[in-house]
């Protein structure tokens, strides 16, 4: 990719620190196998790099068309898809979820205890679609999140709920109807399976299979041919290996492309974390977000709807006041949450730059942010689980914003 940092308003020598930083701090000491980075401002690619390897055992260098597991970077895509139906008048954010999933009318709230001795009560108010999009619905991740054990998590396992094992999105949603909520909807924030339910709502409301809706309404208009829920055989050689660290902090294989579950199309595609994508494809999604819903002259979602989605929906609170447990794809201080995106409300409180940006990330150390005020977005792709291993977001943001020149000489 041709880059022009000067035209994009960056000092080239300063922005090149990003390459040096990632190479010397992470690639050379083998803390990660490889990564890709793209920085774009004012519609101009300012920085693009493919570093290290996509597969250590097979000695494959990171390539421009490498396919990544983007995990929770699926969530903003699913949220945009659902809000497309909102724009068609198919639902209101304040609609109770049971309007579309009748069995969810019976949800109860956890009070105390566990298993057969668990005490529950009726909710003070029904769960709405807005609650699902904001992760304030009272759902959890059923014990999946590292270091976070919640009292209702065991009920997910007892109900046979699995992020990967559902037969269909419908059976997944029906099983969730039998699990007590952690709190009254709208009163707290907890990272959860809620966006998987949003994917099912896309299916119910549109009358189309979820994956088909994404393909027709987003991936085709956005020219994202490599984004999907499984890897075709003809693209297998482009699929990156995924890694984790052993007890000695050495890289070890977590998911081999040759034997990966992604080789088989899922029967219940996860709207919360199931997509594979490339840097090119996801950059088109970010182009659309930065251009206020427009891509290649076509308005996919309105500016007003996108502004609603990226606004803080936690009232006057931040994640620091609302979150149950500490897990998130970001720090909680000074950060709000909207309809599928986090947003920096207070840069001083969050200890970062980019106030007013919106963003999210994925389990395998992928991340993006969009900053409308600076007309900028950034994407980072690696394949190291979990994403909390290194603070790539903070480091990359510091270098990127520290490289803005505004016409001065570096």
Question: Where are the predicted features?
Answer:
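Short, conserved catalytic-motif segment at the N-terminal edge
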Residues: 6-70, 90, 106-113, 118, ...
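Short, conserved phosphate/pyrophosphate- and ester-handling motifs at nucleotide-, phospho-/glycolipid
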Residues: 11, 75, 278
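Active-site SXXK
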Residues: 16-23, 43, 69-100, 195-203, ...
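Short clusters of small/polar residues that mark proteolytic maturation junctions
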Residues: 50-52, 255-256, 382
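Short, surface-exposed loop or secondary-structure junction motifs
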Residues: 106-352
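Short, surface-exposed beta-strand/loop micro-motifs that present aromatic residues
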Residues: 357, 364-373
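Short, well-ordered beta-strand elements
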Residues: 368-369, 375-384
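Generic C-terminus detector
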Residues: 383-409
């Amino acid at each position: 990719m041709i880059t022009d940092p000067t035209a994009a308003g960056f000092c080239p020598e300063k922005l090149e620190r990003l390459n040096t930083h990632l190479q010397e701090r992470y690639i050379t000491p083998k803390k990660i196998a490889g990564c890709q980075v793209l920085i774009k401002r004012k519609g101009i690619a300012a920085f693009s790099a493919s570093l290290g390897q996509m597969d250590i055992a097979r000695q494959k260098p990171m390539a421009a068309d490498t396919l990544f597991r983007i995990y929770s970077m699926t969530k903003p895509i699913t949220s945009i898809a659902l809000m497309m139906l909102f724009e068609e008048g198919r639902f209101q954010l304040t609609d109770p979820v049971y309007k579309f999933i009748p069995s969810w009318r019976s949800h109860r709230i956890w009070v105390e205890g566990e298993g057969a001795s668990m005490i529950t009560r009726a909710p003070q108010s029904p769960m709405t679609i807005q609650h699902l999009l904001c992760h304030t619905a009272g759902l959890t991740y059923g014990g999946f999140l590292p270091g976070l054990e919640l009292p209702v998590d065991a009920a997910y396992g007892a109900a046979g709920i699995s992020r990967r094992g559902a037969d269909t999105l419908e059976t997944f949603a029906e099983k969730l109807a039998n699990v007590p909520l952690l709190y009254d909807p709208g009163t707290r924030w907890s990272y959860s399976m809620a966006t998987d339910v949003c994917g099912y709502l896309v299916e119910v409301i549109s009358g189309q299979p979820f994956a088909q809706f994404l393909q027709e309404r987003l991936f085709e208009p956005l020219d994202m041919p490599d984004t999907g829920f499984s890897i075709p055989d003809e693209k297998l050689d482009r699929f990156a290996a995924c890694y984790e660290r052993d007890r000695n902090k050495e890289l070890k294989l977590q998911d081999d492309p040759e034997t990966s579950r992604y080789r088989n199309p899922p029967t219940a595609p996860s709207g919360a974390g199931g997509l594979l994508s490339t840097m090119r494809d996801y950059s088109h999604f970010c182009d659309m977000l930065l251009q206020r819903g427009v891509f290649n002259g076509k308005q996919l979602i309105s500016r007003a709807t996108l502004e609603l989605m990226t606004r803080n929906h936690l009232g006057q609170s931040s994640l620091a006041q609302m979150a149950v447990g500490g897990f998130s794809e970001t720090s909680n201080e000074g950060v709000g949450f909207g309809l599928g995106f986090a947003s920096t409300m207070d840069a001083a409180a969050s200890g970062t730059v980019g106030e007013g940006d919106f963003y999210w990330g994925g389990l395998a150390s992928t991340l993006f942010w969009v900053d409308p005020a600076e007309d900028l977005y950034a994407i980072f792709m690696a394949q190291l689980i979990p994403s909390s291993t290194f603070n790539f977001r903070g480091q990359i943001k510091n270098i990127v914003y520290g490289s803005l020149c505004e016409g001065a000489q570096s």
